[in-house]
A protein has these predicted regions:
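Active-site bordering "gate/hinge" segments
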Residues: 1-229, 366-371
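Short, glycine-/Ser/Thr-/acidic-enriched flexible segments
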Residues: 32-33, 97-99, 140, 202, ...
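A short, compositionally biased
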Residues: 179-185, 243-245, 336-344
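Short aromatic-centered micro-motifs
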Residues: 188, 250, 345
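Oxyanion-binding "anion nests"
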Residues: 217-260
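Active-site lining segments that contact anionic ligands and/or coordinate catalytic metals
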Residues: 228, 244-246, 253, 279-283, ...
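Dual-mode signal for accessory low-complexity, basic/Gly-rich regions
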Residues: 258-325
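Internal helix-turn-beta structural module
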Residues: 296-371
Length: 372
């Protein structure tokens, strides 16, 4: 066993979810590579007399189920796991896929039904709102290949980003949170991007190892009807096992009225047509993890890239709620560092970030070199 899993499990139990005696915790492993960490979490949960429950989801089994399932089957599957989740006080989800095509051959229609009747019910409505939760990946050959690293090299990277000094990060985030809470107008200018929106009256929140590992975000949400202009994202992103790049959104009064993504424009618009809320924004956040510099086409890592922000179509964050509701929540990242084209972010006409670096004195501790 990799001894670093012991430290990671400890951080998850005591820092991320603050598990207590007699609490039910669901440890869910999606892909069997994550069992080593899951077993360590269960071991440490038992030490404090919590009640761990293990659920293993095999990607191939899920794929076969969805291919053959009726809409009613998917509805019943969601109801069953919803009832299980209602009994939990805590949740840790470990994802360890072995392929980019884990759900290959599943139709877009079935994936949309799964998102609507399973993901939205079990996770967005119950797990996110009513449990102490944290989700993470597990370092395996698949993630190493995606990152163009050796397995050992990726493991070293992984444990660095997951076990960063989150207490230091938490303190450094406070001035940004306070500034966002006082800000009305946000203006973002970058290649292919000229976007304005208001965050007035929407609470901001710090994320420092509590919901995601790796972590590092300060997030809020635009006032629902305030987004105007256009944005062109400069990272690849995956949704429903489809990889998108060069996504551009055009907004009028909060709504995405035009969406393009090279040859995947049709698929992009099908996702945005999931429901009315999918064409409105549910999150605006800064990525702040000092060890994550480049995209992996994996949201859990990419949304934490230092010198980046993400603007998220779909369901609003509970902590920063603008009232938008949707079955989707899709964090799409734009990196503002100079090597990615640069860019500027203004709060109430004051420049706060240029080329991925905070320039206000009170925010400079959040720059990558100061968080390591």
């Amino acid at each position: 066993m990799d001894n670093r899993n012991e430290k990671l499990a400890h951080n998850l139990i005591y820092n991320s979810i603050s598990l207590n005696e007699n609490e039910n915790i669901l440890v869910e492993v999606i892909g069997e590579d994550g069992l080593e960490l899951a077993n360590e979490i269960i071991k440490q949960a038992k030490i404090i007399n919590a009640k761990p429950h293990l659920n293993i989801i095999n990607y191939e089994d899920l794929r076969n189920f969805l291919i053959n399932a009726t809409e009613e089957d998917i509805i019943e599957y969601g109801k069953k796991d919803y009832e299980i989740m209602k009994k939990m006080q805590a949740y840790i989800g470990i994802s360890a896929p072995t392929s980019d095509k884990s759900l290959k051959d599943v139709s877009q229609e079935k994936l949309e039904l799964y998102n609507k009747y399973y993901t939205a019910l079990v996770h967005l409505e119950q797990r996110v709102k009513h449990t102490k939760w944290c989700i993470l990946r597990y370092p395996n050959k698949y993630f190493a290949k995606k990152s163009n690293m050796t397995l050992n090299g990726f493991k070293d990277f992984y444990y660095n980003v997951c076990n960063v000094d989150y207490n230091k990060m938490k303190i450094a985030m406070e001035p940004l949170k306070e500034l966002m809470n006082k800000t009305d107008k946000v203006h973002i200018v970058a290649p292919g991007t000229d976007l304005t929106f208001s965050i007035k009256g929407i609470p901001s929140e710090k994320y420092y190892g509590t919901f995601n590992i790796p972590d590092g975000e300060v997030a809020t949400c635009p006032v629902k009807n305030s987004v105007n202009g256009y944005i062109t994202y400069n990272t690849k992103t995956k949704y429903n096992d489809i990889v998108f790049e060069d996504i551009r959104f055009d907004f009028i009064n909060g709504k995405i009225i035009k969406a393009t993504a090279k040859e995947k424009t049709k698929e992009l618009n099908e996702i945005l047509d999931t429901d009315d809320g999918a064409r409105y924004i549910g999150e605006f956040a800064f990525g702040l993890n000092p060890y994550i510099n480049n995209t992996m086409c994996d949201t859990l890592f990419d949304e934490k890239i230092n010198g980046s922000f993400h603007l998220t179509p779909g369901m609003a964050l509970e902590e920063s709620d603008n009232g938008n509701r949707s079955a989707i929540h899709w964090d799409i990242v734009k990196i503002l560092r100079k090597e990615f084209g640069g860019g500027e972010i203004y709060f109430d006409d004051i420049l706060i970030m240029k080329d991925g670096k905070f320039i206000l004195e009170e925010l400079k501790e959040l720059n990558a070199e100061n968080l390591k």
